Amino acid sequence: MVHLTGDEKAAVTALWGKVNVEDVGGEALGRLLVVYPWTQRFFESFGDLSTPDAVMNNPKVKAHGKKVLGAFSDGLAHLDNLKGTFAQLSELHCDKLHVDPENFRLLGNVLVCVLAHHFGKEFTPQVQAAYQKVVAGVANALAHKYH
């Protein structure tokens, strides 16, 4: 559960309505893979990830980034039940993929950076604070099934 004020919830929802999930998702996942290259080991089937340009232009990275932000959108619609919303994804990432749960926090922070880049002055400190709460809540929910 993420505790947001009414104003924070409104700010998150208003900005998210303007997000191009495909563009932002691809950029966020791509940046994660470039900035934290050890995360690439989970995406070996994606082909060429040898350079930042290769990562950022990789169609599989873009497609998976869109999928990730689709799940994030579901989370925004269920802020009062993030653990339930992400239970299956948590189990998948824990039991089958063996993803370090710290990677969820890293991706959330990268997403905040990408949103700031895309929305400039509209991404005020207050909006950032609200999004930081949301990405922390999502990361916590995704890590929930870990032992």
Swiss-Prot record:
Q: Tell me, what is an example of a GO biological process annotation in this record?
A: hydrogen peroxide catabolic process
What is the protein name given in its UniProt record?
Hemoglobin subunit beta
Quaternary structure, from the entry: Heterotetramer of two alpha chains and two beta chains.
Mind naming one GO cellular-component term on file for this protein?
blood microparticle
Q: What family name appears in the similarity comment?
A: Belongs to the globin family.
| Keywords for this protein | Acetylation, Heme, Iron, Metal-binding, Oxygen transport, Phosphoprotein, S-nitrosylation, Transport
Annotated signal sequence range: none
